[in-house]
Regions:
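Nucleotide-activated sugar donor-binding and catalytic core shared by glycosyltransferases
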Residues: 1-260
């Protein structure tokens, strides 16, 4: 699981021995290193894809690929119960609520959470009574989060419960990844804030490794900017605050995100 180089090696060995192979699921060739699609052809007879934009990429490389859908689409109710999620979390149904999801790895937390917390502090000055929730994926993450939160008022660290926090929240501030897809399925307005190391970013830019105009799945799937993406130097407390404030103040913009 989540070891594509190892798995593809095993698949290639099996395929060379005459065993038909299926690769489940496709790596993110839509985002970067599209050339991996051609390499997968040597290992897999068929690739199962979570997203509809992936099979056409494989078709360009002569690979049989099928869109099967994402399991999160079945795991999250079509109409999430916001009030029920708030009651389950012990939150008032009428209080403004912001969820922060800086990532589930310690490096992501230490890199992104301080900026997210500064943005939340600025937002509390604009949104009276704003409460903040930060789900922690495990005990290590909780310790890292608690070491950073300082004296930010009205903040709770949760043990897991990320999906419940998203459903309960008015707005989600997150660092992209699968969490953005989850927030979309929870029908929550969101702001994407993300930074990678300067060296990694320079390499990605220099070699043109990033193929998509967007990095978050809601925007990639829509083919347009539905939610703001603030990346690298644009990912500042002031910019995040402005984007979050927009969602809290513009009910029409929030309503436009909801399916009819």
């Amino acid at each position: 699981i989540d070891a594509p180089d190892f798995n593809l090696g095993v698949e290639r060995w099996l395929k060379q021995g005459g065993v038909r192979t299926v690769h489940d699921v496709s790596p993110s060739v839509w985002a970067w290193r599209e050339n991996r699609a051609a390499k997968i052809a040597a290992s897999a007879d068929r690739v199962l894809c979570l997203f509809p934009m992936e099979p056409p990429i494989y078709a360009r490389h002569g690979v049989d690929a099928v869109f099967i859908g994402h399991p999160l689409a079945d795991a999250i109710p079509l109409q999430p119960d916001r009030d029920g999620a708030r009651i389950a979390l012990g939150e008032a149904v009428d209080a403004p609520l912001l969820a922060l999801l800086p990532g589930s790895r310690l490096g992501e937390i230490t890199r992104m959470l301080p900026t997210f917390l500064q943005a939340a502090r600025l937002l509390q000055a604009d949104v009276p009574g704003l409460r903040v929730m930060v789900p922690a994926a495990n005990a290590q993450c909780r310790a890292a989060i608690e070491a950073l939160v300082g004296d930010l008022p009205a903040l709770r660290v949760l043990d897991g419960q990320a999906q419940a926090a998203m459903i309960a929240s008015d707005v989600v501030l997150l660092a992209s990844g699968t969490a953005a897809l989850e927030a979309m399925l929870c029908k929550r307005p969101m702001v994407i804030g993300h930074r990678i190391s300067g060296l990694t970013y320079a390499i990605v830019k220099a070699f043109g490794l990033l193929k998509s105009a967007h990095v978050s799945l809601p925007n990639v799937l829509a083919g347009e900017t539905l939610v703001p993406e603030l990346l690298q130097d644009d990912c500042t407390p002031a910019n995040l605050h402005a984007a979050l404030r927009h969602w809290f103040r513009d009910a029409d913009a929030v309503a436009a995100l909801q399916p009819t």
